[in-house]
């Protein structure tokens, strides 16, 4: 049984507290945990208590890492989970961190998918958007629900804008209409547009002269 002889807030990180046992530095834990557990100088702690504290501290650190991971931009649950896994947190800590983010609406795959679709629709087709969301771990049902709201005419118009610009660039180095149309087809395919849209857009764009 060891005795806590000193609690010292870290100079560089006020959220962490150095714990001294029997006059020697032992470890650091979250200031939040110090408060919640009512830890104070002269408390006696055994190895079991130290294990419990270490586990709870790991959960808090994982939660803080999860919050930090979404500070700059939105992420899906899979993206956050993968990042925390790479940092070495165990499954219990990761699950609790994910639950915390969901509870406070910091993590919502449906909201993410909705914003992603709106953001990418001007430069990508629904097929590429679908694949990207699948790679990010969004469920198939959520993806299809969000994609079902896409106006196909609007998607086609966006594809036509891209196609017209592409044709303009291709004509600067290529005069063969057949080769231009083939390159345009592959370009639109790479952007994730479906056959029906590509067929109509290529036909329209090839009749459209767009010179600087």
Swiss-Prot record:
Purpose: Modulates RecA activity.
Gene Ontology cellular component annotations, sorted alphabetically: cytoplasm
Pfam families in the record: RecX_HTH1, RecX_HTH2, RecX_HTH3
Name of the protein this chain belongs to: Regulatory protein RecX
Main subcellular localisation: cytoplasm
GO biological process: regulation of DNA repair
InterPro entries the UniProt entry points to: RecX_HTH_1st, RecX_HTH_2nd, RecX_HTH_3rd, Regulatory_RecX, WH-like_DNA-bd_sf
Keyword terms: Cytoplasm
Gene3D superfamilies in alphabetical order: Winged helix-like DNA-binding domain superfamily/Winged helix DNA-binding domain (1.10.10.10)
Record family assignment: Belongs to the RecX family.
Compartments, record wording: Cytoplasm
């Amino acid at each position: 049984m060891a005795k806590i002889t000193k609690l010292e807030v870290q100079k560089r990180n006020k959220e962490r507290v150095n714990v001294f046992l029997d006059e020697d530095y032992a470890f650091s834990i979250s200031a939040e945990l110090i408060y919640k557990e009512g830890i104070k100088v002269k408390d006696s702690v055994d190895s079991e208590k130290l294990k419990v504290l270490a586990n709870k501290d790991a959960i808090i650190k994982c939660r803080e890492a999860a919050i930090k991971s979404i500070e700059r931009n939105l992420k899906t649950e899979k993206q956050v989970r993968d990042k925390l896994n790479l940092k070495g947190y165990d499954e219990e800590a990761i699950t609790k961190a994910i639950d915390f983010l969901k509870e406070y609406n910091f993590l919502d795959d449906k909201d993410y998918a909705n914003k992603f679709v709106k953001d990418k629709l001007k430069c990508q087709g629904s097929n590429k958007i679908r694949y990207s969301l699948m790679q990010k771990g969004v469920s198939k049902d959520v993806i299809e629900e969000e994609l079902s709201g896409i106006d196909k005419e609007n998607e086609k118009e966006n594809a036509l804008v891209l196609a017209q610009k592409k044709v303009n660039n291709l004509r600067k180095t290529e005069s063969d209409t057949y080769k231009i149309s083939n390159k345009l087809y592959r370009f639109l395919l790479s952007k994730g547009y479906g056959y029906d849209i590509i067929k109509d857009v290529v036909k329209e764009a090839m009749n459209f002269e767009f010179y600087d």
